From Swiss-Prot:
Protein name: Iron-sulfur clusters transporter ABCB7, mitochondrial
Subunit organization: Homodimer.
Domain ABC transporter per the UniProt entry, residue ranges: 465-699
Mitochondrial matrix side: 20-133, 200-252, 305-375, 424-746
Membrane topology designation: Multi-pass membrane protein
Localisation: Mitochondrion inner membrane; Mitochondrion
Ligand binding (ATP): Y474, G498, G499, S500, G501, S502, G503, K504, S505
Single GO term (MF): ATPase-coupled transmembrane transporter activity
Variant or mutagenesis effect after changing V222D: In namako (nmk) mutant. Nmk homozygous mutants exhibit steatosis and die several days after hatching
Annotated ranges, domain ABC transmembrane type-1: 133-429
Entry function: Exports glutathione-coordinated iron-sulfur clusters such as [2Fe-2S]-(GS)4 cluster from the mitochondria to the cytosol in an ATP-dependent manner allowing the assembly of the cytosolic iron-sulfur (Fe/S) cluster-containing proteins and participates in iron homeostasis. May play a role in iron and lipid metabolism.
Catalytic activity annotation: (glutathione)4[2Fe(III)-2S] cluster(in) + ATP + H2O = (glutathione)4[2Fe(III)-2S] cluster(out) + ADP + phosphate + H(+)
Encoding gene per record: abcb7
């Protein structure tokens, strides 16, 4: 359709402009004019411009002065914000839903995250996992005790070798005794180190099942919860960013679980244990230096890590945006190719990568600063405590073995301390990563079923549908359904037609309870759908959608998805009913043929046939058909409709139609207009009604056929016979041309 020209006038007399914009035809636009200025005063005016007829001179002026007009448009675009006025919402349309996840998701406090994680580590319904946790803690205690014994064994070995404090080694006195004691102590030293390592590895082995089970349960709960959220959430989410956040959060679970149970708590315990030993064996000065060093180390680590957290947040944000941009671009591969925008997409993706690179460099440089500060603090503390030990040896209060013991105790803490810094840093970052994961679990769905809701009792014989004064709006103040009432008798075929945005597809979504009407009630078999369980409700409904989206798997999997318990023979049978079986067998891999991302390797007709077949396989009492052939050619549409006729025989069915020729055999046709049922009746009755909206729609779609009939002089029966013969020949030629290629609807 030809583009239309719209004149926008700023209504201030002092400064009046006329801007001519080339805009695609649509219903209406809201235009916010931000450029109206009079004596320094800003005015904002909202106007609605209907795009109707155009003055021919304006159209002519566009072609004669194209360059100047283009410049004016670019200048005007800086001052105008054009927003499509919508009264409905379709998932693949250009409208906007005010459900930004940034506004919906509220962050969960870290304490709540830790509390929730502990409930997975110590589950009430898994005594076997609780036993594993108890055994792991016992092994941890054994590892710490044997670890503390190592410096003492080293001390006793040195003291045995150096029998007199402050003197050189004297091995002439009782050499056999010294050798025996030294050997025993050194063996004890080796056993202590090996025992500590053994306890640690056994602990990791026993606790591994606990950690992996927790990860599995959390990930499954998040996945299931996402499927239980309402459609509004999923229409507003960003798939790339969400998948990145879930992936990072899941990876962080294992680290945080191990860190909390086996690193942070035990390391703090070991710090106080070492300080107590130093106080008891060496005096208060040693304990004070040790506690001071450890406290300074911990405080420095916490403060710097908290400061560094913002760089990790920036890095995660850039990572999310880069992932989302990549997925969005790859999903729209064909569109990118249509407009030769590969370089633009690469540059856009690289822009996000630059942000990630900048944030990552900040994270790396601040990590180097943190590591150096930790090493400096520990080195100062170690030097101070060694000086105190040297003074004690010089004064005769301590032995060389005491010096070795003090050095060993503090050095043994260096590893968990260094790891403590890493653990705290990574735990903080993991908690940030896990925030979205646990926040998703806190998102509450707007569609809820009642407690102990009974299942929907429905059979094909009593499968009635009744809308009772239903009002619904996606956005406040813009009603899509405005008091709709109708009934579909059991076993009847009812069609719903109307213009774009009249609420046809909304009726399907309300039946599935993807949304809840603001007013009114919906009944199936006399039962209010709000009073029955969601699972039983959706089990009773089958749908052939307008856009049949398939899983990235083989054809058999996508067919069997209608009933995952169906046998292969049942799958083959529904494929035959949908006219798909022979075409599949002609494909190189038959039913194992991969359909590609969202089924893009199949034609539109093949995807629709798969959708029909799996709807047949589901075998629901009620079938919904949502404009499934609106984008297909006439022959493919006719073949699909032939498949559908057998399927809906003696079954309650609702056909939402764009092409009226597909619903002429409906028992009743409902015509929606402005959110209400404007007309109802059979096809012929509506055509015979003077001035009916349905007749107007029918005549508009069939104007070419009607004109050709008026100009023809052949008898009606002869013309129909000739047309039928031509149609059959054309269909036969098409089928022969694709024979062997596997495409049943070229």
């Amino acid at each position: 359709m030809a583009p239309m020209l719209v004149s926008l006038n700023c209504g201030i007399r002092v400064q009046r402009r006329t801007l001519t914009l080339l805009i695609r035809q649509t219903s209406s636009y809201h235009i916010w004019d931000k450029s109206c200025i009079n004596n320094g005063t800003n005015y904002q005016r909202r106007r609605t411009y209907a795009l109707n007829s155009l003055h021919p001179q304006r159209t002519a002026s566009w072609s004669t002065n194209r360059t100047e007009n283009r410049r004016q448009i670019l200048e005007a675009a800086k001052h105008l914000q054009v927003t499509d006025k919508r009264t409905c919402w379709h998932g693949n349309a250009g409208g906007r839903l005010n459900a930004d996840p940034k506004n919906v998701l509220k962050e969960v406090h870290s304490a709540k995250i830790l509390s929730a994680m502990l409930s997975y580590v110590w589950p009430k319904d898994r005594p076997d996992l609780r036993a594993r946790v108890a055994v792991s803690l016992g092994l941890l205690a054994g590892a710490k005790l044997t670890n503390v014994m190592v410096p003492f064994m080293f001390k006793y070995a040195v003291d045995e070798l150096n029998q007199m404090s402050g003197h050189m080694l004297n091995l002439n006195d009782a050499p056999s005794t010294v050798a025996t004691m030294t050997t025993a102590v050194l063996i004890g030293y080796g056993v202590s180190r090996a025992g500590s390592a053994l306890f640690n590895e056994l602990r990791n082995t026993v606790f591994g099942k606990v950690a992996q089970s927790s990860i599995r349960r959390i990930a499954k709960n998040v996945f299931l919860h996402l499927h239980n959220l309402d459609l509004g959430f999923h229409l507003s989410r960003q798939t790339g960013a969400l998948s990145k956040a879930i992936d990072r959060g899941t990876r962080g679970i294992s680290f945080v679980l191990s860190a909390l149970v086996f690193n942070l708590g035990p390391t703090v315990f070991e710090m106080f244990l070492v300080s107590a030993i130093l106080y008891y064996k060496c005096g208060g000065e040693f304990a004070a230096v040790a506690l001071g060093t450890l406290s300074a180390y911990t405080i420095f680590t916490i403060l710097v890590t908290q400061w560094r957290t913002r760089f990790r947040i920036e890095m995660n944000k850039a990572d999310n945006e880069a992932g989302n941009a990549a997925i969005d671009s790859l999903l729209n591969y064909e569109t990118v190719k249509y407009f030769n925008n590969e370089k633009y997409e690469a540059e856009r993706y690289d822009g996000y990568l630059k942000l990630y690179e900048s944030s990552s460099l900040k994270t790396t440089s601040t990590l180097a600063m943190l590591n150096f500060g930790q090493s400096a603090i520990f080195s100062v503390g170690l030097t101070a405590i060694m000086l105190l030990a040297s003074k004690g040896i010089a004064a005769g209060n301590m032995t060389v073995g005491d010096l070795v013991m003090v050095n060993g105790l503090l050095f043994q803490l260096s590893l968990p301390l260094n790891f403590l810094g890493t653990v705290y840093r990574e735990t903080r970052q993991a908690l940030i990563d896990m925030n979205t994961l646990f926040t998703l679990l806190n998102v509450d769905t707007k569609i809820k079923e009642k407690d102990l809701a009974p299942p929907l009792a429905v059979t094909p014989q009593d499968a009635t549908i009744r809308f009772e004064d239903v009002y619904f709006e996606y956005m406040e103040g813009q009603k899509v359904l405005n008091g709709v009432s109708f009934e579909v008798p059991a076993g009847k075929k009812v069609a719903i037609v109307g213009g774009s945005g009249s609420g046809k597809s909304t009726i399907v979504r309300l039946l599935f309870r993807f949304y809840e009407p603001q007013q009114g009630n919906i009944y199936i078999s006399g039962q209010n759908i709000r009073d029955v369980s969601l699972e039983s409700l959706r089990k009773a409904l089958g749908v052939v959608p307008q856009d049949a989206v398939l899983f990235h798997n083989n054809i058999f999997y996508n067919l069997q998805y209608g009933n995952i318990n169906a046998t292969p023979e049942e799958v083959y049978q529904v494929a035959r009913l949908a006219g798909l079986h022979d075409a599949i067998l002609r494909m190189p891999h038959g039913y194992d043929t991969q359909v590609g991302e969202r089924g893009l390797k199949l034609s539109g007709g093949e995807k629709q046939r798969v959708a029909i077949a799996r709807a047949i396989l589901k075998n629901p009492p009620i079938l919904l058909y949502d404009e499934a052939t609106s984008s297909l050619d006439s022959i493919t549409e006719e073949n699909i409709m032939t498949s559908m006729k057998e399927m809906v025989k003696d079954r309650t069915s609702v056909f939402i139609a764009h092409r009226l020729s597909t619903i002429v055999d409906a028992d009743e046709i409902l015509v929606l207009s402005q959110g209400k049922v404007a007309e109802r009746g059979t096809h012929q009755a509506l055509l015979d009604t003077p001035g009916s909206l349905y007749a107007e729609l029918w005549n508009a779609q069939n104007s070419k056929i009607l004109n050709s009939r008026k100009s023809s002089s052949a008898p009606a029966a002869e013309r129909l016979s000739q047309k039928e013969e031509e149609r059959k020949k054309l269909q036969e030629e098409i089928l022969n041309s694709v024979k062997g290629c596997g495409n049943c609807s070229c």
